[in-house]
């Protein structure tokens, strides 16, 4: 038996990928060029020198932390003439029946009583603390705080400031 060697593929047409370059259609060349330029442009943003951050100015929120019952801080000015001595303003007197104004700036409620806190007049307080004479924080609830002032219980909604004045008995007070 005679065996004739067979050719692996017909020789009429050579394969397209062997020894030839792949040509890109002329329409897509500008598109590829634009994509490469954009990649270099936006990729270079990561390595450019960033400008130095500017110093932060005092925020408006800082003014909210100043207690309402303290007198305003005035800048020291050297006296020009030695005139009569100026009397200092007396400190705000706390009346036993009137509660002074309270600035309520933060309210944190948690399921654990140790984690609950509020910020009154710029200071943090927990349940059982006494921010002012005769004022006790009884309970910090989810949407309000229960206070006791001179034995009278009253509530204050979370983040509502107390304008000052007498505590009156009301149905909401308990």
From Swiss-Prot:
Pfam families: T2SSB. InterPro entries: GspB_C. Keywords: Membrane, Transmembrane, Transmembrane helix, Transport. It is a single-pass membrane protein. It comes from the Bacteria. It is found in: Membrane. GO terms for cellular component: membrane; type II protein secretion system complex. Belongs to the ExeB/OutB/PulB family. This is General secretion pathway protein B. It comes from Klebsiella pneumoniae.
């Amino acid at each position: 038996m005679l065996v004739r060697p067979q050719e692996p593929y017909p020789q009429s047409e050579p394969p397209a990928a062997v020894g030839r370059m792949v040509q890109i259609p002329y329409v897509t060349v500008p598109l590829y060029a634009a994509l490469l330029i954009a990649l270099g442009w936006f990729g270079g943003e990561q390595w450019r020198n960033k400008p130095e951050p500017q110093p932060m100015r005092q925020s408006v929120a800082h003014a909210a932390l100043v207690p309402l019952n303290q007198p305003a801080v005035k800048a020291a000015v050297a006296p020009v003439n030695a005139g009569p001595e100026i009397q200092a303003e007396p400190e705000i007197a706390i009346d036993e029946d009137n509660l002074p104004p309270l600035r309520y700036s933060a309210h944190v409620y948690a399921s654990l009583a140790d984690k609950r806190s509020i910020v009154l007049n710029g200071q943090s307080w927990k349940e059982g603390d006494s921010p002012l004479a005769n004022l006790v924080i009884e309970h910090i609830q989810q949407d309000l705080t229960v206070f006791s002032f001179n034995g009278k219980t009253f509530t204050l909604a979370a983040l509502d400031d107390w304008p000052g004045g007498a505590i009156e008995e009301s149905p909401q007070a308990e």
